[in-house]
Amino acid sequence: MRFLTSLALALIALEAALALAPALNLPGLATCPELSSSSEDPCVISCVNDESCPQGTKCCARSPCSRSCTVPLLVPVPKAGRCPWVPAPLAPELCLEKNECSRDDQCRGNKKCCFSSCAMRCLDPDTEAPLQ
């Protein structure tokens, strides 16, 4: 009997600790995956909104008649500015450099992932309006 009481108290303490834990801060926008096209999905509503889901999940439509807590897809937030202008080479050149990035979210601070002569680099963005 003591074991069950201790186990119950431990579970209550764990639940309280998880409820007080700070939200997971991930860069980007959390979006729900696409709806399932399967006609076999049962019509079950297991959540009402994101607040009714465990931390790190969202309340998403899984089919036209069901909602459940789901791990969201993260879409990177676009960074401000645009990549600096790089003149094109007059003749093809061999590039021995390796790419440093492939997306803006792989660059620190406000830097953007931009083409720089022959490879992708994290560069400071141009914030001026483009010439017309």
From Swiss-Prot:
Q: Which residues form the WAP domain?
A: 23-73, 76-126
Q: Does the keyword Protein transport apply?
A: no
Where is the protein localized? Secreted
Gene3D superfamilies, per database record: Elafin-like
Biological process annotations from GO: antibacterial humoral response; innate immune response
Q: Which GO terms describe its molecular function?
A: serine-type endopeptidase inhibitor activity
Disulfide topology: 32-60, 43-65, 47-59, 53-69, 83-114, 95-118, 101-113, 107-122
Protein keywords: Disulfide bond, Milk protein, Protease inhibitor, Repeat, Secreted, Signal
Family matches, as InterPro entries: Elafin-like_sf, WAP_dom, WAP_four-disulfide_core
Cellular component, GO, one term: extracellular space
| Organs and tissues of expression | Milk-specific; major protein component of milk whey.
Asked whether the UniProt record includes Ribonucleoprotein among its keywords, one would answer no
Instruction: Tell me which positions the record assigns to the signal sequence.
Output: 1-19
**Where is it mostly found?**
secreted
What job does this protein perform?
Could be a protease inhibitor. May play an important role in mammary gland development and tissue remodeling.
Q: What is this protein called?
A: Whey acidic protein
Taxonomic source organism = Sus scrofa (Pig)
